[in-house]
Amino acid sequence: MTDRELPQALETAVQAGRLGVDAVLVQDWGLFGLLRRTLPDLPLHASTQMSLFTSGGAREIAADGCERVVIARECSAEDTRTICENCPVEVEVFAHGALCMCYSGQCGMSALIGGRSGNRGRCAQPCRLPYGLNAPAGKAYPLSLKDSSLAGHLGEMAEMGVDCLKLEGRMKRPEYVAVVTGIYARLLEEGRGPTPAEEAELEQAFSRSGFTDAYWKGTHGRAMLGTRSPDTPEPKALFDAARAAYEKDTARTVPVRFTCRIAADVPSVLTAEDPDGHTVTVTGAVPEAARTRALTAESVEERLMKTGGTAYRCSEVTVTVDDGLSLSAGAINALRRDALSALSEARTAPPVRRELPVPPLPEDTCRADAPQFTLSLHRAEQLSDGLLACSPARISLPLDVLAHETALPQREGLIWCAELPRVWRDRDEDLLRRWLDHAASLGVTAALAGNLGHLPLLRGTGLTVLGDYGLNVFNGRSLAYLKDKGLASACVSFELRFAQIRDMPKVLPAEAIVYGRLPLMITENCLVQNAAGCRRDREGPAVPADGPCRSQQLLRDRTGAAFPLLPAFGHRTEIQNSRPLWLADRPDFRRLGLAFARLRFTTESAAECAEIFRAYLEGRPAAGDFTRGLYERGVE
């Protein structure tokens, strides 16, 4: 969300809060911080696009006032249980619907290929197209996953403490929503798994070659892949029945608990309470002395139970009646009607929520006249004397690479930085802490954090924390939020235009990637393993020293473009853009107020890294094929 979009987003949230929405789902750090300060009583939920998949990340956002966390689709049952046991707020799980190959909130593929940002909800779904691994694209769809269905695991989720299910229905028809929601609601109410008939209905409603629950089970592989033919017929009979059902007046009734007191010489009193905590009390007629038959608690209960024709049903009733009194049936009915009417008003009344003034941004004090160059290397072998001779301000290496190093060359003014894995799990944190200790012993003094969950890992290490591109910094409010979290700088999103970066208030030293193959995806599935096969657990979560993923692997699309695949921590895959970003001959990036300009080296040799750095120092044009990225054209 850009700086110019934030005021309208805030106004929308204000109006939604006044209308009584239960919560606002937020992805952007800047908007989250702004809403927390201006609308402190409005519940906020963390979107799955915040890329939260550890209990540390969930606790971090909870400490800032978030009330529910939607965890990553890739989380297994074990991961989810760990988060539920260690997270102080509600946990929401993605239970049914389309799976992205990339971790949500980390995909640049749609933006860089088609100009539509998946991180802004405008994904053009390039993952549903054919690709070839080290071969021309044919009829294989290695990025297209089956839809997820966890209908058979609802009891397990309830037992571990999952609070909410997300049923994805983006771009789906209302009939689809009716079928899927209806089945899941029945399963929850009846505490059971789906029948074969219900499983068939879910598949008829929409699927891609069936469903998968592999992520939940902690497994992966090519069996998760699936496609859907564009000429797949609509399930007419199923959708007709669903349409007929939701067009009928079949609204579910709300259970209500009545407490009635009828005493001599005072008005009759009835209290009604619903499961959401709304409680109302009304008074009615004063009872008279009975002339013949006295009023009984049973007769009052019978009258109060008659809620037919209303949105309510009496689930429990407690009646206390003094002896020897009389109250007409009409008076009791009126008491019930008044109570239910008052309860309806209470249920529909918008909550009273504070609306505080918009806090000003801190002063734009971190705007630099010209950026210093920083480097990120994928391999230690890319380091050379020629590269060091160019005097970078900072060099970062992946933490799992630093773990195997015994020494780092030191230069005056050079900062060594550890790049933490973009994706990891709670079970990896002891290993990551050991690696951080080792990195510090080598002279590393800073760490790149691309996820909120990195922050608890880094506290107490003494390392300077720098925000990486995985945080999707899109506005000055996000910089302010991260500054409050203790970060010393932050890399802005490569989906921004030059003008948007220039106008962004620099309340924190800002960095931008100005060279390199931009990251398109990071995937839980290892694309090389899916195609060629290898033992996923050969060396724990670290990238294996041998195997097919260590050699050059290319994903090719229908146009022949080749996207390098790089192994990532946890046997994951990172897809790089087919062409490197080149801005050496464009002075624009030097005039944006950036403190740092990053050269991101991935597939380059040591000699190429040094030569490219020299080209940037001299402002030379590119020697080969390149892209200007999104800095000039922007994204939807």
Residues covered by each model-derived region:
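Surface-exposed amphipathic alpha-helical tracts and adjacent flexible/coil segments at the periphery
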Residues: 4-17, 26, 38, 42-45, ...
